[in-house]
Regions:
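Walker B catalytic acidic pair
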Residues: 1-2
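Arginine/glycine-rich "motif VI" loop of SF2 helicases in the C-terminal RecA-like domain
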Residues: 245-246, 273, 299-307
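Short beta-strand-loop-alpha-helix junction that forms the active-site gateway
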Residues: 283-291
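Interdomain motor-coupling "hinge/lid" segment immediately C-terminal to the ATP-binding subdomain
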Residues: 34, 38-147, 151-152
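Conserved nucleotide-binding/hydrolysis micro-motifs of P-loop NTPases
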Residues: 32-37, 56-61, 189, 209, ...
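Domain-level recognition of nuclease-like catalytic cores that cleave nucleotide substrates
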Residues: 314-335
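Accessory nucleic acid-recognition modules appended to NTPase machines
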Residues: 103-278
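Conserved catalytic/switch belt of AAA+ P-loop NTPases
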Residues: 10-29, 42-43
């Protein structure tokens, strides 16, 4: 465990692997950092290892069904008895987060756990990777970024607000990506000459960490206010990332937004015999679905045509419902 702290071991592991190339799976090396970016690592074991990037537990893993296909994948039939998906059932786990210890030990105080986790992260993982300089300023940057999860990322504005250089903000953002705290989602562009937003969006990979950073401890408070949608969207994007990463695949995930503000929260790119296909997903905090929630998906279909696959509005209800042509209201629990 934490192999990045002992990079000298990798040379010996390489020698052992090369001496037993016909035997696979003898070594499992884990760590909380991107090994390729860790200090002192010169041996990458290229050609000898399979790399898996594991985020906190997914909803599938927490409900004991980790191999269930996504709804749009082959075999992705609806659940016979989906887990509770009401708002009351959804927000507690969203505030608590999905780290294994918090899932396995429900009596643990999530606030104290995240406080300790972030303290350890700042004192150990971050300083192991780079010289931060002003640690307090970095903490303020992380909190400010948490308040912007699921929003268009204006690093220049954020840097100006905090009184730091834009290059510092870029470096710190890259550090958060390297330590798997955040992911930057790029907008999807097609060669259509359309006026589309080119600014990326940032998402935290764990909603419990996000809620802790913005001072939310109560599920009712997390479910209220103008940022509730951003928090739920963060949870859905995290689930889509986990679905790919936890089976060894690279996420092919985007969002779509026009210059006038028409948006689709997530696009999952897949391929079939017809070529590229885009599965659109909208995220809504309501427990009641309506056809108007699919307006962004309809606009996307009008712009991209047959490239757009049947879409979904992920919501907090408990049943699948048709929302017009090629759009289904999908309970969060079925994602």
């Amino acid at each position: 465990d934490e192999v990045q702290h002992a990079p000298a071991l990798l040379t010996y592991v390489k020698e052992r692997i090369d001496g037993e190339r016909d035997r696979r799976g003898l070594w499992v090396l884990t760590g909380s950092q991107n090994l390729l970016l860790a200090k002192g690592v010169t041996e990458t074991l290229a050609g000898r290892v399979a790399l898996l990037r594991l985020l906190p537990l997914s909803l599938r893993e927490m409900t004991g069904d980790p191999d269930r296909p996504l709804p749009w994948e082959a075999g992705g039939a609806r659940l016979a008895a989906p887990p509770p998906a009401s708002p009351a059932a959804s927000w507690p786990w969203l505030v608590r987060g999905c780290y294994p210890q918090l899932v396995a030990e429900p009596d643990l105080d999530p606030h104290l756990w995240h406080q300790s986790y972030l303290g350890t992260y700042l004192e150990r993982d971050v300083r192991d990777l780079t010289q931060i300089g002003d640690l307090l300023q970095f903490q303020l940057f992380v909190r400010a970024l948490a308040a912007r999860s699921a929003q268009l990322l204006n690093l220049s504005g954020l840097a100006r607000e905090l009184g730091i250089a834009v290059n510092t903000a870029k470096r710190w953002l890259s550090l958060l990506e390297a330590t798997y705290q955040v992911v930057v989602l790029r907008p999807y562009h097609a060669s259509l000459g359309k006026r589309l937003v080119k600014t990326p969006k940032v998402y935290f990979t764990d909603t419990g960490t996000l809620c802790h950073l913005v001072g939310l401890r109560d599920p009712d408070h997390a479910a209220a206010g103008p940022m509730a949608g951003a928090r739920l969207e963060t949870a859905v994007v995290a689930e889509l990332l986990k679905a790919a990463l936890h089976r060894g695949e690279q996420p092919d995930l985007y969002f779509w937004r026009t210059a006038t503000g028409v948006e689709v929260d997530a696009l999952v790119r897949t391929y079939d015999e017809r070529g590229e296909r885009l599965v659109p997903l909208e995220v809504k905090t309501t427990a009641t679905a309506s056809a108007r929630m699919a307006a962004g998906i309809a606009r996307l279909g009008g712009d991209l045509g047959e490239r757009v696959a049947p879409g979904y509005v992920v919501y907090l209800g408990d049943r699948r419902l048709p929302l017009g042509q090629n759009v289904t209201a999908l309970p969060l629990a079925e994602l």
